[in-house]
């Protein structure tokens, strides 16, 4: 016999109130409600998209475990937003399942056959804010999406980290897939292309590798600058590019620098990359940054006073990723501590990056090593001792914050760690410090020391 939904959710709340900290429970769990249990799936409502995304990312497994303990069997969890409308339909890909057994998934949930690969649903043209800094890149991307393989082939998107290159590339993919659901649209990072090539060589399956990539109708390749020094990968990519281009298939490439500035890039590849259109994306101006924040707030159903928007936009000028990250930190901080959204209240959690000077990796390593009483060799080593691992994770986070180094380069500074290790460390520290005042204070103190070191080195 099924438990009434009110009783089930009440028991879930009792369990989670014990497991989670009070600010976390009050902010993210207590504000949600259970809508219904249908087809072995629990539908949960949240007050806004930000809360939904936060629960989905950090607490969905905790909720699922609690429900499973109460009911005695695993259930799917579907999180939606309270908008006054009944949830009449949800798809399998929107439901999180604790059980990996396919037989436990309700047959009534439809299966989807996606032709695209690794495309983020948020990266569409309608969510891209156009400004003077990216107008040409946006127009070219839209033209390519509407008529692939024609005027701009290849399209080479060039710009610094976090300026919207990946957004535009994936928007092209989404646009083409909507028009042509049967098209083969491949989005791949240069690192993934290289890894696939290495796997093909190891498994003696080069023919399958070539057939796979050369069957694309649209090939979207991110971070092409990582072809640097990879001679055999450059060789294979050259022939893949030629095959697609000669067949009239669209190729879109993104890089943090123009083709002629990528070290050790083969001249013939540089020539091919330059034969279409190179569209440069610059840093957004103040008006564009404010528009980006306003758009992000509207998408997440967040009310932002104009002075808060202007404060964040004025202090975070480097790139969009940094800008949106500042907004997320501010909203999380305000939500957790139950404060009104004002400039005064968000200032403690937002250290204006414009007051910082670019720090050297060596300076960051030294500051972190001194603070945690470990050696730089410890930070670069492979020790899993708790205190060393913690210091290493904080070091990676700070290096991400205080330098423009890519994730692989940061990994190299820490003794050749994989970029996925850097991502994990940065995500972990970001998640923890938003609800931990002690950690937030430690990070601010370390940042101050890094900034002081940078100033002394400059003077």
From Swiss-Prot:
Location of the region described as Domain III, AAA+ region in the Swiss-Prot/TrEMBL record: 118-334
UniProt feature coiled coil, ranges: none
One annotated GO molecular function: ATP binding
CDD domains the record matches: AAA, Bac_DnaA_C
InterPro entries attached to this UniProt entry: AAA+_ATPase, Chromosome_initiator_DnaA, Chromosome_initiator_DnaA-like, Chromosome_initiator_DnaA_CS, DnaA_C, DnaA_dom, DnaA_N_dom, DnaA_N_sf
Residue segments, region Domain II: 73-117
Localization (cell): Cytoplasm
Residue ranges of the TM segments: none
Region of interest (Domain I, interacts with DnaA modulators), ranges: 1-73
NCBIfam families with a match to the protein in the record: DnaA
Subunit structure as annotated in this protein's UniProt entry: Oligomerizes as a right-handed, spiral filament on DNA at oriC.
Similarity field: Belongs to the DnaA family.
Protein role: Plays an essential role in the initiation and regulation of chromosomal replication. ATP-DnaA binds to the origin of replication (oriC) to initiate formation of the DNA replication initiation complex once per cell cycle. Binds the DnaA box (a 9 base pair repeat at the origin) and separates the double-stranded (ds)DNA. Forms a right-handed helical filament on oriC DNA; dsDNA binds to the exterior of the filament while single-stranded (ss)DNA is stabiized in the filament's interior.
Name of the protein described by the UniProt record: Chromosomal replication initiator protein DnaA
């Amino acid at each position: 016999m099924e438990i009434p939904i009110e009783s089930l959710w009440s028991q879930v709340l009792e369990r989670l109130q014990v497991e989670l900290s009070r600010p976390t429970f009050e902010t993210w769990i207590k504000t949600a409600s259970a809508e219904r249990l249908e087809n072995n799936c629990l539908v949960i409502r949240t007050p806004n998209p930000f809360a939904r995304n936060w629960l989905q990312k950090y607490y969905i497994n905790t909720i699922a475990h609690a429900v499973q303990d109460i009911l005695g069997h695993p259930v799917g969890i579907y999180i939606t937003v309270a908008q006054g409308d009944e949830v009449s339909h949800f798809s399998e890909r929107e439901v999180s399942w604790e059980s990996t057994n396919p037989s436990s998934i309700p047959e009534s949930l439809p299966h989807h056959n996606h032709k695209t690969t690794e495309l983020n649903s948020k990266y569409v043209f309608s969510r891209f804010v156009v400004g003077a800094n990216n107008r040409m890149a946006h127009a070219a991307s839209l033209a390519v999406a509407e008529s692939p393989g024609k005027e701009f082939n290849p399209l080479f998107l060039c710009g610094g980290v976090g300026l919207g290159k990946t957004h535009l590339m994936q928007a092209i993919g989404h646009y083409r897939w909507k028009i042509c659901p049967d098209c083969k649209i491949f989005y791949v990072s240069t690192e993934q292309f290289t890894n696939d090539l290495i796997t093909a060589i190891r498994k003696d399956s080069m023919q399958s590798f070539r057939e796979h990539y050369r069957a694309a109708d649209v090939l979207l390749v991110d971070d092409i600058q990582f072809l640097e020094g990879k001679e055999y990968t450059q060789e294979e990519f050259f022939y893949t590019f030629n095959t697609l281009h000669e067949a009239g298939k669209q190729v879109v490439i993104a890089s943090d620098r123009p083709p002629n500035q990528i070290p050790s890039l083969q001249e013939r590849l540089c020539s091919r990359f330059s034969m279409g259109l190179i569209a440069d994306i610059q840093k957004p101006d103040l008006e564009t940054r404010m528009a980006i924040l306003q758009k992000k707030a509207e998408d997440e159903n967040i009310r932002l006073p104009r002075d808060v928007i202007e404060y964040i936009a004025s202090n975070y000028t480097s790139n969009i990723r940094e800008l949106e990250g500042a907004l997320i930190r501010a909203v999380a901080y305000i939500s957790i501590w139950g404060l009104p959204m004002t400039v005064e209240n968000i200032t403690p959690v937002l250290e204006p990056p414009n007051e910082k000077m670019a720090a050297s990796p060596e300076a960051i390593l030294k500051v972190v090593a001194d603070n945690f009483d470990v050696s730089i060799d410890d930070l670069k080593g492979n020790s899993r001792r708790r205190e060393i691992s913690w210091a290493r994770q904080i070091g990676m986070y700070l290096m991400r914050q205080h330098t423009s180094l890519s994730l692989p380069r940061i990994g190299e500074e820490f003794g050749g760690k994989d970029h996925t290790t850097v991502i994990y460390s940065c995500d972990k520290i970001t998640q923890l410090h938003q609800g931990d005042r002690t950690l937030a204070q430690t990070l601010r103190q370390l940042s101050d020391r890094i900034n002081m070191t940078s100033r002394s080195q400059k003077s």
